[in-house]
């Protein structure tokens, strides 16, 4: 069993899983598994009888992680969860983020059923701040919605240029131009400029992602 992202043996911070969650949840139409207690930041730092304190939730002992006990008592609706005061501030922020991302898989046509195009192959030698070791970008598109997704795995907020190859425009039937976009993660509105083999300017918070949705 793998060590938890939030454990002292790995990242020590459950929020650092969010950019990876966005990529895993939004890159395709496949089912997604949320590891037990992950949405509340399970740390795997209990000292279970057989496994011991190893950053993992044991698969050998009869054990009850606190995060799973909390999840079992939460109301079904997010607003009721907020009002219940069953979660501390950090847990609630994380739970809301997971709720938002997982709901988007169902409510966004592009994420639910859209075509996928990976743009990383043209961004490995960026001169506009895009770091392929810490940033990841891709496109999803249906007839009525397109999404430019950019994940930031670094501890610093970024303002970078994401290059979009001409082949992406041909494959996805994208038009060039300036589009009014909305980040599905934050609700923030912005304009994005799309040109064949050109760069699109994007701002992404630390350890987070943007899902810039626009009408193609």
Language-model-derived ranges and their functions:
Residues 101, 181, 207:
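A residue-level signal for conserved active-site and pocket-lining positions in enzyme catalytic cores
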Residues 4-178:
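Loop/helix patches that line or flank the sugar-binding groove of alpha-linked glycan CAZymes
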Residues 145-146, 157, 187-192, 210:
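Short, surface-exposed beta-strand/loop "edge" segments at domain boundaries and coil↔beta transitions
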Residues 139, 182, 213-215:
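Residue-level detector of conserved, well-ordered beta-strand and adjacent loop positions
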Residues 1:
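Active-site neighborhood of divalent metal-dependent phosphoester/pyrophosphate hydrolases
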